[in-house]
Amino acid sequence: MGVSLRHLSPSSFWVSRRPRVSSSILSFLVPRRRILCTRKVAIIKGNAGYSTATDCGGSHGFHHSGHQRSSSVEFSGEWKLNLGSKTARMVPPTVKQAGAVSAWREEVNNKLRGRNREYANNQDDAFGNGSYILKGFVPKIDDVHSYGNGQNFDYNLKPGTDITTLGRELNGFMQTNSIRGSVVALPSKDIEVGETTDVTLKPLNSDTTLDNASYKKTATISKVEKCTNLSQVRANLKKIYNRVRVVDNVSSAKETVALLMNQYRNLVHACDTEVSRIDVKTETPVDHGEMICFSIYCGSEADFGDGKSCIWVDVLGENGRDILAEFKPFFEDSSIKKVWHNYSFDNHIIRNYGIKLSGFHGDTMHMARLWDSSRRISGGYSLEALTSDPKVLGGTETKEEAELFGKISMKKIFGKGKLKKDGSEGKLVIIPPVKELQMEDREAWISYSALDSISTLKLYESMKKQLQAKKWFLDGKLISKKNMFDFYQEYWQPFGELLAKMESEGMLVDRDYLAQIEIVAKAEQEIAVSRFRNWASKHCPDAKHMNVGSDTQLRQLFFGGISNSCNDEDLPYEKLFKVPNVDKVIEEGKKRATKFRNIKLHRISDRPLPTEKFTASGWPSVSGDTLKALAGKVSAEYDYMEGVLDTCLEENIGDDDCISLPDEVVETQHVNTSVESDTSAYGTAFDAFGGGESGKEACHAIAALCEVCSIDSLISNFILPLQGSNVSGKDGRVHCSLNINTETGRLSARRPNLQNQPALEKDRYKIRQAFIASPGNSLIVADYGQLELRILAHLASCESMKEAFIAGGDFHSRTAMNMYPHIREAVENGEVLLEWHPQPGQEKPPVPLLKDAFASERRKAKMLNFSIAYGKTAIGLSRDWKVSREEAQDTVNLWYNDRQEVRKWQELRKKEAIQKGYVLTLLGRARKFPEYRSRAQKNHIERAAINTPVQGSAADVAMCAMLEISNNQRLKELGWKLLLQVHDEVILEGPSESAENAKDIVVNCMSEPFNGKNILSVDLSVDAKCAQNWYAGK
């Protein structure tokens, strides 16, 4: 895939080390010695007393036990090493203008002053508001461009330090203007990942008492990166160009295809396309984008003339379509093996030109994810990230190739300064369009784009070798004479091809329906906005004009006057805000209405509202959870809104809008104004506003604000995106991207995220109803029942859970019965029923159902069933239930009392994760874990060790079911195709006349997904429906 960023560089290494740093000893920042311009260090083992940052100008700290007082200040910025003057400076995280830089600098100074107030405040007179002291921390910023990593700035002061000593220490240690000796000395040899080496540290200022101190520590290399030398990169590009055959005419294309399909047909061919006119973040490649070139590489043994082993094909010119047509037989030949990096993208791009790819042999992105599922966080799966990591290539490349295959971004090679109005280049770097590069910087572009296919084949060979070295365990048992590359070929290779087919099929969307519910949603949103504004304006008149979507304005309204939780700043009681002057108000002193006007917002309660949630900057949160806590579990409707609905509906829905509002919207015009005496459902705002009618009004109004946010989420995340042409093809079908990029192996979706549909109970506009079958067709929506709990019962060999599944019925009610003796007694005495199957003429059960009579206990049982499967602890449950940790632990123990096998299995998985560094799913996929360095990290690993085998095995089952459905010959004959998988649910489309027959086949495939068998010790329950839209199929 040729539209991502890539890396290409010479082989000189940066080495990265990260230390463990004691917070009780003095640290100061010093620049690196010049040799470190080609090495970066990050220690993962060894108690070295210094710290480092990233990029060419890192920061180093040196610690001394003579200073006992320590604190840490965190802010954004990065130390940049100036090799010319041997100085280091802190620079802002992004390109900024001078005014913004000053504000950034002031912010840093304020943070430092806030953490060391007793020193800074005492020096205001002597040093001009502490500027001398603080300049020691934040050097003058001349270059405001570059970098963007947050830093931990360790600031230490010895108690009783006098002014002179303090000034000398800060000047010497922090401004780094007197550099002497090496900061970190490394051996001159090449350093590799995992190697242990000694590092030496020295202080930098001869005026300090630390002058003769030096530390030598042992460090283990954790990361190796390659340094960028642009001239060397261009030289390497030249070497690649000399190995590339350029195909830019039909005659050359015919010769090349003949060699590919005859002499070299038995080789593995790595292919890649380069595409323009597409935004890969927002647009589907189906019917979008223009292919400008592609490359093919089948190894150095191939010779396409003059020793050239790589093919680069130009399809940009006038005869581009004719050239591409010559390669159609090659691409469609199923016997010629082809590998890709992100196959689905290239597949869609080539299909746009009427070519149906065949001969899919592997996707190196999927292979890398199978090899190490944790790289999504630690390195990524882009071609540049993988080929730049020596651990990935695993020694498969030669020394010369090692210099060529590490890649840097297009921006580094092709970036140019954006032209200013006067024609000169500015500092903002932009990348010219790839079409322009192909025509104007042709040789470099050919080399750069051809490198994609060369790197893909190298990556394929490496991943094949790495996977062959891994044993394959199926359901915990070793499969002899097979390895994880066999697993890839048997499962993930056909699964990758199936996902590409599903993306190509897409789902038909009823845009008229979406347009209608958009009108309704916006109308309801306006109603909710008016409800909140009308209430708030009773307490603060200008709130009638506020922006209810502004966190800043809401925070002022609810929490004005509150103190910051991180420092001594206070939020003002009242504040002016600039808002659009929609009413054309002419403010005092002005002759006409301006575009914006000022409003004054102040706190609307006698004291700041109660809250337990704060932002990272220390101010009260106004997130959805905070608002829900204030409102409680009440509706947005209340009698003070009389007349508001009619006005909003008239303004938002005209006579020409042919749409029926849902009943619940219309009924809000006749709200019952009688308010119940029970106040348990009301939130914390009830007491804050004095209880009674005022408290109830406040809760209902804030509930209306919650409704505003909820509706806005549905509009912005679902209703509007699904109507966009960027996610659909020419046929009006929505084509999302399906990816195996989660650590557990579950699928994710994007552009758009169809897996993120609102829960049925929250789908107030029935958005799934917009996904429809084509005329003459129907949908089959099939869903596993309690899949993960059934997998847990199998993995843990839990007899109690197995028996409950065999008995059938409401699993959560059975769990509650086994947890609570009083419920079991009620069931045995016939006072309640576990479940009830009505007979003709029966309207209600003879006695209450367990789920109704003991709703609270069943609710806890249901939450525990899923929470324990995901590794949730009593601590998390106590927060969810708002009970003590002891009470939550007692309830958890009740669950385990009948399921001791689950507890034992979980303990084994936790031990396995810590000792071996990985856990396995049902089909043998591994999830790796890093070494933990804190209790919190260990807890996270242990939770993931419990969750991954369950959730990952569910992904295995779903994948096998999809392969079983896709390979079913009868379903193919009937014309049914898979469209989408959403967690444990699959959706197919096909002719309506065979829907019921096809549904039975689908259920059978999902019930026995392992090549026509079920290897689990529990049955797989499947529910399926035939319908005309997704919502009706649920």
UniProtKB/Swiss-Prot annotation:
Which tissues is this chain's protein expressed in?
Expressed in shoot apical meristem.
- What GO annotations for molecular function exist for this entry? 3'-5' exonuclease activity; DNA binding; DNA-directed DNA polymerase activity
Q: Please give the InterPro entries that the UniProt record associates with this protein.
A: 3'-5'_exonuclease_dom, DNA-dir_DNA_pol_A_palm_dom, DNA/RNA_pol_sf, DNA_polymerase_A, RNaseH-like_sf, RNaseH_sf
Q: Quote the disruption phenotype from the UniProt entry.
A: No visible phenotype under normal growth conditions, but mutant plants have reduced levels of DNA in both mitochondria and plastids. Double homozygous mutants polIa and polIb are sterile.
| Keyword Cell membrane belongs to the record | no
| Compartments in which it is found | Mitochondrion; Plastid, Chloroplast
Q: Name one GO cellular component term.
A: chloroplast
Keywords for the protein's UniProt record, in alphabetical order: Chloroplast, DNA damage, DNA repair, DNA replication, DNA-binding, DNA-directed DNA polymerase, Exonuclease, Hydrolase, Mitochondrion, Nuclease, Nucleotidyltransferase, Plastid, Transferase, Transit peptide
Q: Which Gene3D superfamilies match?
A: 3.30.70.370, 5' to 3' exonuclease, C-terminal subdomain (1.10.150.20), Ribonuclease H-like superfamily/Ribonuclease H (3.30.420.10)
What range is the organelle transit peptide? 1-55
The protein's Enzyme Commission number: 2.7.7.7
Q: Which reaction does it catalyse?
A: DNA(n) + a 2'-deoxyribonucleoside 5'-triphosphate = DNA(n+1) + diphosphate
Where are the stretches annotated Polymerase? 700-1030
Q: Which GO terms describe its biological process?
A: DNA repair; mitochondrial DNA replication; plastid DNA replication
Q: Name one Pfam family in it.
A: DNA_pol_A
CDD domains from the entry?
DNA_pol_A_plastid_like, DNA_polA_I_Ecoli_like_exo
Ranges where the 3'-5' exonuclease domain occurs: 270-468
Q: Which PANTHER family match?
A: DNA POLYMERASE I, DNA POLYMERASE NU
Task: Say what the protein does.
Answer: In addition to polymerase activity, this DNA polymerase exhibits 5'-3' exonuclease activity. Required for DNA replication and accumulation in plastids and mitochondria.
What is the protein named?
DNA polymerase I B, chloroplastic/mitochondrial
Source species: Arabidopsis thaliana
Print the organism lineage.
Eukaryota, Viridiplantae, Streptophyta, Embryophyta, Tracheophyta
